[in-house]
């Protein structure tokens, strides 16, 4: 009798569990949502005919899981920040997650002013089609609050400026108004017209109805200005009022040239009309950091100068001088150094004074991953890009000059098609190419236009927008991206495994291959392990500023990440050039130094002022006493000697005689970059694939120097003292010279930032140069100047290179003795000894058939060959490519 009774009890318990299942089995976040807003239970936020008890309040998939809509994502971020589920729900209720003009609280709870509420706080007409496991037509009436009984717009009155006022550009003035409505005023926006009301641009958005606002008057002088105040009531009705008559914005006094913001207006996303970027330290870090510092996006990005672009005191001190020289020119700088602050209108003060701590996170995650290619290619770019491009008044002609476009919606884009993210995501070919990099790494000054002569640039009409926004019709400030486009890296790719990371073939072709090299790891804490994860280190050439950022912005940096980033910079610099010494001595000591550019752009490249590379040559006599030095650097004073033999690689922009006469300046090389209109010299080493014609086309010609087409190296000859018997050569790189830091200190008449930078520079060690490569050589002389030249020790470059299946190695031996030529793989392991025997002085060659000591064919890759003879040793690289 007991067994049936026991079975009946199980059935009863199971039935009770089933009856209780809907409430108990709910997602805990959904439970918290309904605890906060019980009126939402049974509404469309929990039930629609095609999906009862759904999770569509937070997820695009109404069955739950997968990508969250903007409201669900905001809650997830709050939970990841340590809040309970209920605390997280309540913490975002005053936000407008879907950016439709209504707070989450209004959408979920305000059933008085609207006829269709509750509405979905994370869905809009722009993203609702992403929803799944639901009939979308059932959602369309519940995206934005509407249908209220209040259809009367607010009463709005502009009090001031209302006509006749005169305000100075870059001053702060009070805008005042009244706005009232029976449903209350939800928000107030301000707009300015400089055409007597014919067209308006936003100057402030989302203000509370305080009746006044401290308005920073942009540097857009004119006499036809009017202000519009737009108020939205709690029922979604809009009312507005404008100034009754024009008011004046007076020109800004000062500046070497009378530029205004109009001179630096460019197409693309505009302030207060684009994206509101997320704070990466509150959002991105929750999934993309804290699990693998070696490769995770967060830690590696935190160590890059991209993350600190707006914290860089060197940049900030430079921008002060630019603003002194050409008022409003800081706008061009802020575009790419704080794209978040720029888009949100905190660039109206072009000195950067309005920038916040969040803005100082520089070139941050949300900026890059919401970028839209301005040049739409059907079948390549996401179709979601089209309406974004269509909404812009002026499309950028190309990817350059900070003319970026950001998706106004919080939709991330990236290079992988198989991402399972908690946020909205689009596979983007743009994010797999170098085109994105060109946006901020081809910089031109739009205050200048191309003149009639070669390499001639003339000022445009001041206080007017550039006529065509074509970077080729402006003065070139930086051409790193364009230099890459004309290199062999961009055309065919180059076998360069030292840069290639995990790329199995070792071929490097894009900017990303070197500056975001492939590594193995996860892009997010729960993501798959990828062998082609782009490392977000974004390493460049600035190795000293990471040491001083914390001094200027305490508490805003990660010291470990910056130290890691600095080391990556040094490592990259030491891969960027190859140094070769050739003994050219006959009767007197002499030396040839060959520097080969291994990068995909000029070496050095990037921002030109104060950046340089040089060859330091030291010669010693038989007793190893120093008897000669060229391009000597004093590490105690940071002075570099400019002796007659000194080879210093740099670009020297400056002021032409033509412009100097016009502006009353001294002609010649100058650090006043925003006033520069000519290049006085440029002897930087071109990349592989260089031709003079192509580099002229991209406005990066060789100036006052000479490189032949196809040349990506430079050779410098040194006549040494008669007593010289050996030499030591070091190739140095310095990202900031003493002269430039002193310039920033001495020319600053605005504040003491230049002095602060100088003091920090001294404390740091004065940006001591990095040794990119070092080599030494013994010099072999004939007995007398008239003797027949002796053979010299020399190891030639193998031919062909790359090779398959065999290659020839030539070498010279200065005196009789043992000679050894050996092959090593990239890990330094001996592959084969080609020669190991006594030889007389003379010229020789050996051939390698691409086989190891056992006669087995070796695999493709990088190999080293080494020559050892009496008093001489040299090693070179070669590539076997099958």
Residue positions per predicted region:
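Proline-centered structural pivot motif
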Residues: 63-64, 88, 92, 107-148
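Glycine-aliphatic tripeptides that mark coil-to-beta-strand junctions in extracellular
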Residues: 97-105, 109
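Primarily the internal scaffold of c-type cytochrome electron-transfer domains
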Residues: 133-134, 254-267, 294-319, 350-695, ...
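Proline-enriched interdomain boundary motifs that mark the N-terminal boundary
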Residues: 151-160, 791-796
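Short, solvent-exposed loop/linker segments at the N-terminal edge
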Residues: 164-171, 583-587, 800-805
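Extracellular acidic, Ser/Thr/Pro-rich low-complexity tracts
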Residues: 175-184, 233, 597, 813-815, ...
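Glycine-centered coil/turn sites that cap beta-strands in beta-rich domains
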Residues: 782-799, 803-824, 833, 848
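C-terminal tail/sorting-segment detector
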Residues: 833, 837, 841, 847, ...
